[in-house]
């Protein structure tokens, strides 16, 4: 046994663990996966939908407050009107925008949700590469109601900055991606409730970071019936802003999958030859089209590429208008819908908060976060699924094993991870975990598997410095340690149905408590938590997993572990 433990401390097993060598990031070139059947895809889509909502801090949805819409400052022009808008998407928090409506066209109209990317002037940007007012004006003239609204931190929506989400906020799933997605969901509520809108005919379009908002919204909200995301669905770049990169968003996935989630609804993918969508016609579009084929709906997807740098320019807009006309207006000749000249309004005539203040009771940034936490605490019912989502856990892969004497190396099939332990006797039913890994000091008298989890003891390995948005694509070290314990549980369970016990000390007691909570089989838990009480500071100091407090934290884990 001492020799086995010595070997464990000497073998370079960490070099074999893909979690140290295959570290995806926003500029990784991903390979689209193929689902064999529609049923396979629907199962995966349902999980991805929950993953998006979990990463956004929106699982479950916050309680929807009254929108209290303020619509004012109406301007009437040739064929359309423009109004300023403020809506309350959370109590005391307001989203600003402009409402463009057709004039001289009675009845209910289809509507277009129109967020924006990282243009300097946001929803009011006007330049050759993108004219957001021009887009909205032309759509309104063509017969749509258009709601152009802000990113967080832009124009009229500045109660938070655009860039936020410190580690404590991450524990509660509070960040710009989630707030923007919630704003979009509430924007759909607002538009669908307008008396001149046909809520069964809603579309959405935007470019760049706005396109990210579009495909995430469309992925989780089936009320959007037609989507035109521009210059963003890519296998080689996943987004460069915090508002596109919440922790946990892209565990085992990337933006092409989010584009696939629009199927079988009509989708137009507009790409550019001069940005990260340059390969669309040969790589990403065929991948998305394969999903439409599963639905027997390949006629619903179209694609075009514009020879230009990153944009939503005139050529891109003129590709978009006929697509919406075909699917939302049911126009007889959709190809005739093209952009016409337009006049811009002054910024003061467009900004909702020009010479105007937010409604009484509007909150500050710290107050918004405090309210987010309070609301989340009312939704802390123990849920194994919610915890598993923030950890990115896998309990379905087959666990394989190899042995070298008393050394046991576990790996999940297709994952490339390596979890090392020492069996102190035949048929162990006890898993022992210590923060420093398997050592003689923690050996019990009974047959046990002494586990060395990820980046502990001699399994510590040098890795590349984390790239931007590391936790968007990769589990935290603590989450990986919990996965390793679950992998060991699954391994022992496959050997025998006899009961399994977890014995864990010091910080490893926290790992084991969460592993027991999410284990698909009941385990006996011997894991004294000591001074760890599950406060925000405890998680920041000893056990960092973004979203863990939003998913129920320690109280949920304890309730589930003792079920």
Predicted regions and their residues:
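Alpha/beta-hydrolase-fold serine-hydrolase catalytic core, especially in secreted/extracellular enzymes
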Residues: 16-94, 270-429, 436-447, 454-498, ...
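Sec-dependent signal peptide recognition
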Residues: 1-6
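Primarily recognizes the serine-hydrolase "nucleophile elbow" in alpha/beta-hydrolase
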Residues: 189-251, 488-562
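Cap/lid segment of the alpha/beta-hydrolase catalytic domain
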Residues: 106-193, 199, 232-243, 427, ...
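Generic beta-strand/beta-sheet core signal
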Residues: 100, 149, 205-207, 212, ...
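Catalytic-domain carbohydrate-binding cleft regions of carbohydrate-active enzymes
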Residues: 205-225, 229-230, 237-244, 248, ...
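Loop/turn elements at helix/coil->beta-strand transitions in domains of secreted/extracellular proteins
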Residues: 108-110, 142-145, 198-201, 222-226, ...
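Hydrophobic h-region of N-terminal signal peptides that target proteins for export
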Residues: 7-15
